[in-house]
Amino acid sequence: TNYVMLATGQPTHAFDSDHIAGHVIVRRAGEGEKLLLLNGKELTLTSDDLTIADDAGVVGLAGVMGGAKDSILPETSKVILEVANFQAAGIRRTALRYDNRTEASARYEKAIDPERCDQAFDLSMQLFQELYPEMQVTGLADQYPVPLKKAEIDVALSWLERRLGKVLTPDDVAAKLEPLGFQLSFDGDNMHVVVPTWRSTGDVSIKADIMEEVARMYGYENFEAEPITTSFDGAINQLDKDLER
């Protein structure tokens, strides 16, 4: 699971199925509910904490760390694999509350693309099959009730040109943004941008973000520095002369 997290950026967690009572669910902790973590730390939870639980109680602190009760051991033969996405702010609050910031929570608190779960799951299955060819998958549950909506932004090409100091055609902008996964459509001067899911978690949300992407891909070093020219028609007073000295 750690390898998959490092390879994809998506945390995963494995439970020993033989130590799970009934069904696995995601729920808020009961006030004062106890949990012993993998690292040996015992927590007294609050109702603000999101947990992974079975029919008998809490088995993991969602997005932070699993519990000791159902941890994977050398003799484990049945595994439940969790590949999940959690709300960033809640995970950060929980990790800070218990002074237990982990590799998983550090990623979740930055708002991970939910679509990345598929990538992490596919890699996990590939590794299971390579390492344990006799493995059998006996069930799959997929809950995605509110799919992430891709951000959509309207930007005028003339607006980009004024700020970047470059004449831009639709082809110029498309050449810079489409390789990054952006979908573009043009209507005269207006450009409609559909942001890919992996950039729709708050990273790209306003037209200034689009301008930054175009400038970045164009290359900041390719923008020529030009001095600001202006004229001063007012009389020079004594204070101005004193400041010049």
Q: What is the meaning of each model-derived region?
A:
Residues T1-K241, R245:
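RNA/tRNA-interacting regions in translation and RNA-turnover enzymes
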